[in-house]
């Protein structure tokens, strides 16, 4: 029982899965360091941001180690929302145990776009390898059915777009 959302397809039928590379330099990384690791904390954080119309993207929650009572919550916001996000989060620190609010405004998102990314094993690995070979560090990774996005240092985003284009788009057409 259930609903089929898409038909099955073969790798051969979708060989040219990547249709473009995009970048977004209007991005800041927000890191909430040492957040209480208990139910409801993430909801509290994101409800507070939503109440002020701060749009959030690329969310990552990482447990420091097994049994650790703290976690780090990292996400991105648009540059226009940085000041407001900082105000909201600093106010939230009064009621939620958050050790630090760190914001890095020197970030950018680079994405590969194409239909059926989830049906193509290895595409993300290829992207990560290409960035690695160029010495570009990935801060955050986000995936969806149609895209794979990486947060990188803003001063490396043009290099990232170039090497991904050359390594993935040109390779699949050749």
Give residue spans per PLM region.
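C-terminal catalytic "cap/lid" subdomain
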Residues: 1-174
């Amino acid at each position: 029982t259930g609903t089929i959302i898409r038909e099955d397809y073969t790798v051969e039928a979708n060989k040219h899965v990547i249709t473009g590379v995009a970048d977004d330099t209007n991005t800041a990384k927000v890191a909430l360091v040492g957040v209480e690791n208990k139910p409801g904390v993430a909801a509290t954080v994101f409800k507070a941001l939503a109440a002020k119309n701060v749009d959030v993207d690329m969310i990552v929650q990482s447990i420091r180690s097994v049994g650790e009572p703290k976690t780090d919550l990292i996400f991105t916001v648009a540059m226009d929302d940085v000041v407001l996000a900082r105000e909201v989060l600093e106010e939230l620190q009064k009621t939620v145990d958050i050790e630090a609010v760190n914001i890095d405004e020197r970030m950018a998102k680079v994405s590969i776009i194409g239909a059926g990314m989830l049906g193509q094993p290895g595409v993300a690995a290829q992207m990560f390898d290409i960035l690695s070979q160029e010495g570009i560090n990935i801060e955050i990774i986000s995936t969806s059915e149609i895209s794979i996005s990486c947060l990188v240092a803003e001063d490396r985003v043009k290099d990232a777009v170039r090497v991904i284009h050359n390594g993935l788009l040109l390779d699949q057409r050749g």
